[in-house]
């Protein structure tokens, strides 16, 4: 666990009356004994391990206390575990020093869990019953004779009726491998496919029995190019440079990896096999079903990480008193939860700019100056400070667009131009000096004055006169997102104007200016979402499609589902261009 992660507060999911530690969701493969090595650091601010004296560590399993042990630098625990998913908790019993209160407790040294290593299974007693095993072993041989496949008699492409009869004739292995291969290859499997898998099964079966045979068959599935790659085959007689429509099975894969970052489920595959997925009504029904599925959380994490630079948060190393790994994680979680609420509740994407609510825990609420929020649990709260509404007031954006010890109006302006307005500035010319390298800049009392000196260079002015005014409106937020009224000894001047002359005087006016051009923001969001969904950069010929999606979404208040449906029904999502000189696969 990160060294600057403070562990003085209760962690959601762990017993009350504890602090810090970790909660690990782990699937144990077999019924067996497992070894757990817990390493504990002496204190969050570098004190020796001797400070662990008197501390107690609670180990819990699925919410029930298993052990209570004195905290030492290294703790070894062995537990007999049943196979399957379990929640392992390792946390400290809260023991505040006499007279301590919340104001001063933050400065007190406290120990923390550094790592938990799980080793095992040791001397397994049974195979156990895990969710993955239940999904794979959809049948079990009734006798040794049933373990041997009855040489592919029926068509392997027919998933249920023929496979049921195969199982009754001793084809349990065939049934298992057929089902797995169909999901893994994202298409019906042929007799030849099954025969190949059964050959691997028989090799493993001879060496170690039925389970070993299935293991070998699965290993063959996992190295098949149809599993490793998303293959899309060109139809016969396609013409170079001409678009063609992908098959329903390929469309199903595009849709599932777009919304779930994973393979199609059986429902989607069944529709694709029938050849009806491309029909608008059917495609809309499946898309809405998938957006409502918990697996759509991957869209929030991956698309949000790509579009809003949330993946870059881990690289930020701000020099700011009180900044911890806890705060960094809370900032990312806030933005993800805002985006998730828009996806789950099918809200307008304009709420990303103008939401009058957000999600905070105690750490983030204190950072923002929000009262009456206690504990590590994230909760939805009303935003009463106009400057904090939407993405522009969130710590994730403000941190990732700053440098270690100051804000960066250039980075913030560039981020807004690229991600909210869709007009990225050109790359800077080579060998441009930093803003504070000139003697004149060294004498300036504020960052804004230094920027004005830098902008005096004609080579720099062309881009900076577009980016800097946007960044200046956000100067009341420091480099870790705290509100301020002064930059050093100079008062903050957040007045500026957009490149079209619109006057600005702070984050509220910038947000209102963006909302006044709501179609521009929605178009940019659509471009980002289509880029993510298609897995390629958009071209000039995609722009009419983007404009059509935005125009149609306006009729439904720019709800998130309207953008997704517009994209999945579009030609760029459903079609592909034959590249010149490519060979038929």
Describe the role of every protein-language-model region.
Residues 1-585:
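Low-complexity, glycine/serine/threonine/alanine-rich intrinsically disordered linker
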């Amino acid at each position: 666990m990160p060294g600057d992660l403070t562990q003085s507060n209760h962690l959601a999911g762990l017993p009350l009356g504890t602090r810090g530690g970790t909660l690990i969701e782990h699937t144990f493969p077999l019924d067996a004994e497992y070894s757990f090595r817990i390493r504990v650091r002496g204190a969050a601010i570098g004190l020796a391990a001797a400070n662990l004296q008197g501390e107690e560590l609670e180990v819990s399993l699925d919410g029930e206390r298993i052990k209570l042990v004195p905290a030492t630098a290294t703790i070894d625990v062995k537990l007999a575990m049943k196979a399957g998913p379990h929640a392992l908790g390792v946390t400290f019993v809260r023991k505040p020093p006499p007279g301590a209160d919340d104001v001063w407790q933050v400065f007190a040294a406290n120990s923390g869990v550094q790592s938990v290593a799980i080793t095992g299974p040791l001397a397994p007693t049974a195979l156990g019953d895990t969710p993955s095993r239940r999904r794979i072993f959809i049948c079990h041989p009734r006798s040794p004779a049933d373990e041997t496949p009855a040489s592919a008699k029926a068509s392997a492409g027919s998933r249920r009726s023929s496979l049921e009869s195969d199982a009754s004739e001793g084809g349990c292995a065939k049934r298992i491998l057929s089902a797995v291969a169909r999901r893994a290859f994202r298409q019906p499997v042929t007799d030849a496919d099954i025969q190949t898998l059964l050959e691997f099964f028989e090799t493993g079966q001879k060496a170690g029995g039925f389970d070993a045979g299935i293991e070998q068959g699965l290993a063959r599935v996992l190295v098949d190019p149809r599993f490793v790659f998303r293959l899309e085959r060109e139809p016969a007689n396609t013409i170079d440079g001409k678009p063609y429509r992908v098959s329903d099975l390929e469309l199903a894969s595009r849709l599932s990896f777009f919304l779930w970052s994973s393979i199609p489920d059986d429902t989607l595959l069944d529709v694709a096999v029938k050849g009806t997925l491309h029909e608008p009504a059917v495609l809309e029904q499946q898309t809405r079903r998938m957006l409502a599925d918990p697996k759509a959380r991957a869209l929030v994490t991956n698309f949000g990480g790509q579009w809003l630079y949330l993946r870059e948060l881990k690289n930020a190393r701000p020099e700011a008193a009180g900044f911890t790994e806890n705060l960094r994680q809370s900032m990312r979680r806030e933005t993800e939860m805002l985006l998730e609420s828009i996806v789950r509740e099918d809200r307008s994407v304009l709420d990303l700019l103008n939401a009058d609510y957000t999600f905070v825990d105690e750490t983030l609420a204190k950072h923002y100056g929000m009262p009456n929020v206690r504990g590590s649990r994230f909760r939805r709260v009303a935003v009463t400070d106009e400057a904090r509404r939407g993405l522009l007031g969130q710590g994730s954006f403000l941190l990732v667009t700053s440098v270690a010890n100051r804000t960066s109006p250039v980075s913030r302006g560039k981020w807004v131009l690229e991600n909210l307005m869709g007009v990225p500035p050109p790359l800077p010319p080579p060998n441009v000096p930093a803003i504070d390298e000139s003697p004149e800049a060294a004498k300036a009392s504020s960052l804004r004055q230094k920027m004005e000196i830098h902008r005096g260079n004609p080579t720099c002015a062309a881009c900076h006169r577009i980016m800097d005014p946007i960044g200046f409106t956000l100067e009341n937020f420091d480099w870790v997102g705290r509100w301020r009224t002064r930059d050093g000894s100079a008062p903050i001047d957040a007045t500026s104007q957009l490149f079209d002359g619109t006057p600005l005087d702070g984050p509220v006016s910038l947000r209102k200016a963006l909302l006044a051009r709501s179609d521009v923001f929605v178009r940019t969001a659509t471009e980002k979402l289509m880029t993510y969904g298609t897995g390629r950069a958009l071209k000039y010929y995609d722009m009419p499609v983007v404009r059509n999606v935005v125009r149609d979404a306006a009729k439904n208040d720019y709800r998130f589902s309207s953008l997704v449906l517009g994209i999945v029904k579009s030609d760029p999502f459903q079609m592909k261009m034959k590249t010149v000189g490519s060979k038929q696969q």
